[in-house]
Structure formats: structure tokens, C-alpha cells
Amino acid sequence: MKLKFTKMHGLGNDFIVIDAVNQQISLSPEQLRRLADRHLGVGCDQILLIEKAEGDADFRYRIFNADGGEVEQCGNGARCFVRYVHDHGMTDKQQVRIETLSGVVIPELEADGEVTVNMGVPKFDPVEIPFIAEQRAPTYSLSLDDRQVEISSVSMGNPHAVQVVSDLDNAPVLTEGPVIEKHSRFPQRVNAGYMQVVDPHHIRLRVYERGAGETLACGTGACAAAVAGIQRGLLESPVRVSFSTGDLFIRWEGENQPVWMTGPAVAVFDGEIELQF
């Protein structure tokens, strides 16, 4: 079976985007892993499937990590999604309603080509994240082997654990991130974020993503970090979130309000691959 796809990225967080509306798609976890493999397949952080909506949305949006596991949400992917459906003539709407496992998100294509996404209302209740804790708190102490780390925990449709660090370049993202990702207090695993506060409207961020490892950028991670910082009184909206590859801009007006994320979405190339595995 030949599979048509488009390679895209949002600040280097890269995706294989597949139109499953106009071509029949049935991919096994093994096929997903092979497609995402940077040596044996196309290579990406996540695979995005565009499907027909089941409800009153315009499209259904499915996200698979490089390990083949399906996840609830991906902010950078949502921006690439709306860019794809516009570029391929699948809609002419500036504002698109997209079904995800975590609910409906509403990306909007801006006049300058950037994409703004209503990422929904963040969740702080440990049961909803999910995170094992007796009650909601601004920060929690997490035991890692012989030490404790202070985290904020929030769901942006997927779970995040955010730490504040003084030196982002030397933060233990690659060594500590995998430990936090699989910590027993996060039943569905977690994305581990490390943020350095530059000023009340600017942070630098690195994220070790659940099922993908450290990525060059993470949209839901940017939202979670900004929200956690605002909750703790460290930040004020709007927040510029800087990754090594560029910036996202996050707006959040407080409790029970949606988070808005603005950033780029870039198409790299179109391709076709024979699925012989």
C-alpha cells in the first residue's frame, strides 16, 4: 500500500501528516513506529491523522507518538493540522473545529500565516490530570530516588509536570525527564517540562515528551508552563515561550478561562511511501 503524506513542523517539533479522509488508512503500532523512525522510515516526533468528524466538528484529529501510542493532544500538531487542511483545499474556514481525544480544539489561521489555537481550559484537579495527590495544590513534592523535586501539575488535554529551573541549558532533561515521565504518581505517564523565568512575560522551556523524548518544541508544554507560572505568581499573561527553535505566545486570563496559543506551522515536503512492513 502506498501512503501519501506531508512532512510538517512547528518550531522543529516535526510531524508526518496523513489525510485519512481521501485515502483509506489502517496503521498498526508497528507501522506507526516504522514511519516515525528517523533511520528506517520517514522520521518524526508524532504522526497526525486527519479523519472525518464523528460529531459536529469539521475534522477529527488523531495523534500518535513515535512509540506508536495514541495521545490526547498536541498543540504544535494542531497548528500544522489547520495549515494542512487549508493548503490542501479541505476547508476554506479560517476557524476550524477539530475533535480530539481530549475534546474539541479550535485553531484559527491568522492573516500573517501564523495559527492561533484555543487549547481549552486547563485542569488542575489531580483526578482529572491524572495525578495521585490528596488535594489540589500550586506545587507538589515529587520523590525521585534519593531526592525531592518541586513540580506544578496541570492537564492541557494531556498531563504535564512543570519545574522551575535557574539554568535551563544544564537542566537534567535527558536524565531526569524519563524518570518523571514514568513516575508512579502519574498513572498515564506525563510530559516533563523545565522552565527558566526570564521576566514576568518571558520564559525559556525544554520538554521531555511522553513517548517521544525531548522535542525541539511542545505546544501543550508551553501552555502548561505559562499557566503554572501564572498560577504561582511568577508570570503574567501574555507569555512568550522560547524554545531553541523559536517562540510561541500564550494568553490565559485565569481560572476557568481557555488558553490561547499562537505560533508558526510549516510544510516541509510532500511524499509517498510504500508500506511493506
From Swiss-Prot:
Annotated binding of substrate, by residue: N13, Q46, N65, G75, N76, N158, N191, E209, R210, G219, T220
Family: Belongs to the diaminopimelate epimerase family.
Tagged with keyword Transferase: no
TM stretches of this protein: none
Site (Could be important to modulate the pK values of the two catalytic cysteine residues): H160, E209
Catalyzed reactions: (2S,6S)-2,6-diaminopimelate = meso-2,6-diaminopimelate
Protein name listed in UniProt: Diaminopimelate epimerase
Annotated Gene Ontology cellular component terms: cytosol
Keyword tRNA-binding: no
Protein EC: 5.1.1.7
Summary of subunit composition and partner proteins: Homodimer.
SUPFAM superfamilies found in the cross-reference section: Diaminopimelate epimerase-like
Location(s) in or outside the cell: Cytoplasm
InterPro entries in alphabetical order: DAP_epimerase_AS, DAP_epimerase_DapF
